C-alpha cells in the first residue's frame, strides 16, 4: 500500500487539475511550497470540501454528502467510512499539530503529521514515514507565509518545494465539511485517551449533520463541534472480548462529560474561549456503537440531541 503522503499527494494532483471547477486556487510560494486555497480567498465548493476531507484521511476512507434523518435540523450529512482507521484517522486526519509563526496560527492535520512524527501519539500508533513529498491541511483564515512552510518542511525532512498545504477556514464550505467529517476520528481519539487498544478496531463508519456555513469562525466552531457532539453517529467493527467494550462504552460518547448538554459556543464562552479548559471527554460523537465481528454482539452508548443541534444551527 502506498505511503500516506504519497496517496494524498496524488489526490492533490487531481484536485489541482480541476481547480476552476472546484472553486479553489492553486499557487506556489517563493520557497516553492504549493498552496491549495479551498476557502480563504476563494469560495470553494461542496466537492472541494469532500475532497479536502478525503485528503485529510490520506485517501484511506470514503467521504460522502448524504441526506439526514427526518429529525435532523439540516437536510445533509457528511458520512465517512474507513477500513484503515488507525492510519486514516489517527496518523493522518487527527488535527494534532499546532502550526505557529509570526502572526500566524493554524491547526494542522493530514499525513504531513506522519512525516514529521513529532507527536507522542505516534509512539502508540506507529505509522511514521520518511516521505519524499508531504501533504498537510491547515484550518486557518490566513494563507501560510514562506517561513511557516519552510519550518513545516524542515520538520518533515523535505525541501519546501516538496510540500503541499491545503488551507480552509472553519467558516467556509470546504472547512465546515472537513471538520464535520471527523466523526470516526473523534471516536478513535477518545478511545485512545481512555486506554482502549485501537488495534482491535477493524473499520469505522460515521455520519454527522452538515450545519449551515457560518459567517464567522467562532459561530462555525460552535456549529461544527455540535454537529459531532450532538449529531455524530458512529459504528465501529471491533475484535476481542465484549466485557471490555461494556466497561469502557459508557465513557465514550459526549454525554459522558459534565460539559455536555448545551451548544458548544456557550461551553466555549464559559471557559473564556480556552479549548484546554474544556473537559477533554466532551470531544466525541453523541452516539457510538460497537459491533464485535468475533462474537456478533452489538453495543450502543449515548444518544443524539437534535434539540441542541437545532438551537446551535439557528444561532448567529
Task: Name what the model sees in each region.
Residues 1-156, 161-185, 189, 193-316:
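Anaerobic metallocofactor- and corrinoid-dependent redox/one-carbon enzyme cores
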Amino acid at each position: 500500500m502506498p505511503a500516506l503522503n504519497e496517496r494524498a499527494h496524488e489526490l492533490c494532483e487531481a484536485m489541482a487539475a480541476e481547480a476552476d471547477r472546484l472553486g479553489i486556487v492553486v499557487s506556489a510560494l517563493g520557497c516553492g511550497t504549493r498552496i491549495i486555497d479551498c476557502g480563504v480567498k476563494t469560495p470553494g465548493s461542496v466537492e472541494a470540501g469532500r475532497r479536502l476531507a478525503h485528503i485529510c484521511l490520506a485517501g484511506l476512507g470514503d467521504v460522502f454528502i448524504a441526506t439526514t434523518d427526518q429529525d435532523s435540523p439540516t437536510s445533509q450529512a457528511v458520512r465517512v467510512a474507513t477500513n484503515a482507521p488507525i492510519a486514516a484517522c489517527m496518523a493522518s486526519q487527527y488535527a494534532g499539530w499546532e502550526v505557529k509563526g509570526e502572526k500566524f496560527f493554524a491547526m494542522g492535520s493530514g499525513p504531513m503529521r506522519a512525516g514529521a512524527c513529532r507527536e507522542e501519539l505516534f509512539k502508540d500508533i506507529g505509522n511514521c514515514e520518511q516521505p519524499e513529498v508531504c501533504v498537510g491541511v491547515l484550518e486557518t483564515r490566513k494563507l501560510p507565509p514562506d517561513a511557516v512552510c519552510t519550518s513545516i518542511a524542515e520538520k518533515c525532512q523535505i525541501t519546501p518545494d516538496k510540500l503541499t498545504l491545503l488551507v480552509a477556514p472553519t467558516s467556509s464550505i470546504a472547512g465546515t465539511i472537513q471538520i464535520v467529517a471527523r466523526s470516526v476520528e473523534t471516536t478513535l481519539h477518545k478511545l485512545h485517551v481512555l486506554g482502549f487498544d485501537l488495534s482491535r478496531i477493524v473499520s469505522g463508519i460515521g455520519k454527522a449533520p452538515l450545519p449551515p456555513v457560518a459567517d464567522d469562525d467562532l459561530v462555525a466552531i460552535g456549529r461544527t463541534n455540535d454537529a459531532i457532539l450532538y449529531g455524530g453517529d458512529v459504528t465501529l467493527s471491533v475484535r476481542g472480548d465484549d466485557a471490555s467494550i461494556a466497561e469502557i462504552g459508557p465513557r465514550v460518547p459526549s454525554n459522558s462529560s459534565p460539559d455536555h448538554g448545551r451548544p458548544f459556543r456557550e461551553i466555549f464562552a464559559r471557559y473564556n474561549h480556552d479549548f484546554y479548559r474544556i473537559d477533554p471527554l466532551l470531544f466525541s460523537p453523541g452516539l457510538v456503537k460497537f459491533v464485535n465481528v468475533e462474537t456478533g454482539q452489538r453495543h450502543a452508548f449515548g444518544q443524539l440531541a437534535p434539540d441542541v443541534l437545532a438551537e446551535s444551527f439557528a444561532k448567529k
